[in-house]
């Protein structure tokens, strides 16, 4: 059976015979959020995909996870923070080469309750700098723990599902972060 519209096509198999490993992964798959492909998202992906692929290979990071994070963090490149002159694709706080911008953001208290704060976010000269800084953070960790994001590395995570699960509660306070990323990757 095939469903199609101008912006999205999906093939649904009537019988999905999965291997035991596949069934186990499928059971743990948290893609519960319905994202749809659209021209804005497709254009945004095209603007960062090649850099994400190159940097992912170079730094041992899943490009699909990187792209999904950028889509989620920026609303497909539509957020003020992601537009020039800020070019911050990942909502990374702090300073980049001495540059930052203060903006309001919502945080999750770890139980699903949201609250608002004003935070300093890194200000980049372009998307490539934002992507490069992101993989440097994922590979270099935090100032107090260089292996803080080690579970996201391709050499440590068997698949992108494990990588996104590891990011939840570490990279983002959103308790559904991995489900959202998984849904974006599956789309």
Q: How does the language model describe each region?
A:
Residues 1-187:
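Catalytic cores of secreted/periplasmic lytic hydrolases that degrade extracellular macromolecules
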């Amino acid at each position: 059976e095939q469903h199609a519209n101008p912006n999205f096509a999906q093939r649904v198999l009537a019988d999905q015979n999965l291997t035991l490993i596949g069934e186990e992964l499928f059971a743990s798959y948290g893609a519960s959020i319905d994202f749809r492909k659209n021209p804005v998202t497709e254009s945004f992906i095209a603007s960062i995909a090649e850099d994400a692929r190159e940097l992912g290979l170079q730094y041992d990071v899943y490009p699909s996870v990187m792209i999904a994070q950028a889509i989620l963090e920026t609303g497909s490149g539509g957020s003020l923070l992601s537009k020039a002159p800020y070019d911050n694709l990942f909502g990374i706080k702090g300073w980049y080469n001495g540059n930052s911008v203060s903006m309001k953001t919502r945080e999750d208290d770890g139980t699903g309750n949201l609250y608002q704060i004003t935070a300093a976010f890194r200000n980049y000269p372009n998307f490539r700098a934002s992507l490069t800084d992101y993989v440097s953070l994922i590979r270099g960790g935090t100032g107090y723990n260089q292996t803080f994001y080690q579970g996201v590395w391709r050499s440590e995570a068997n698949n992108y599902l494990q990588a996104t699960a590891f990011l939840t509660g570490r990279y983002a306070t959103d308790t559904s972060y991995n489900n959202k990323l998984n849904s974006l990757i599956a789309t």
